[in-house]
Amino acid sequence: MIHDRIEDFLASLPRTGALAGLDLGTKTVGVAVSDGLRRIATPLLTVRRTKFTEDAAKLKAIAAERRLVGIVLGLPRNMDGSEGPRAQSTRAFARNLVQVLPLPVGFWDERLSTVAAERALLEADTSRKRRAEVIDHVAAGYILQGVLDRLDWLGREGGA
């Protein structure tokens, strides 16, 4: 099931279990995973996109190996909050993904996640070559950590 509101997505999940965060690009998919208690997001890998069926098979394997209970897709909104062609492409990917990987899917505003990831990698004095290799899954980590922080906040506020 696909949830537009992150609160609805979080409410659909079991109390524990790992989540994945995906940073969907035209050529790659950055993947990050959480721990089972959903406290920490860890960048995992970058999948080179080929055909959807092959991409989905790789994501299914990760979901099985990590025992995922849900997936968060970064939703690329424009700076004014509107959705453009990239956001529509992300929504289409989600619709296709739930057909082959029946897990709850939620969206998280990914504006500036790649900028934050790039800044963190620069501050860590990461080489240009290494930054290019890891930027997508580091950005996925930022996306997923945002969701985990929201979940924590909702829990403290009694909303989840």
Curated annotation (Swiss-Prot):
Function of the molecule: Could be a nuclease involved in processing of the 5'-end of pre-16S rRNA.
Family under the similarity heading: Belongs to the YqgF nuclease family.
GO biological process, one term: rRNA 5'-end processing
Pfam families, per database record: RuvX (PF03652)
GO cellular component: cytosol
Assigned keywords, A-Z: Cytoplasm, Hydrolase, Nuclease, Ribosome biogenesis
Domain of life, source organism: Bacteria
EC number of the protein: 3.1.-.-
Protein localization: Cytoplasm
Keyword Endoplasmic reticulum: no
InterPro entries: RNaseH-like_sf, YqgF, YqgF/RNaseH-like_dom, YqgF/RNaseH-like_dom_sf
Group of enzyme by EC: hydrolase
SMART domains linked to this entry: YqgFc
Organism: Cereibacter sphaeroides (strain ATCC 17023 / DSM 158 / JCM 6121 / CCUG 31486 / LMG 2827 / NBRC 12203 / NCIMB 8253 / ATH 2.4.1.) (Rhodobacter sphaeroides)
Protein name per UniProt: Putative pre-16S rRNA nuclease
PANTHER family attached to this UniProt entry: POLYNUCLEOTIDYL TRANSFERASE, RIBONUCLEASE H-LIKE SUPERFAMILY PROTEIN
GO molecular function, a single term: nuclease activity
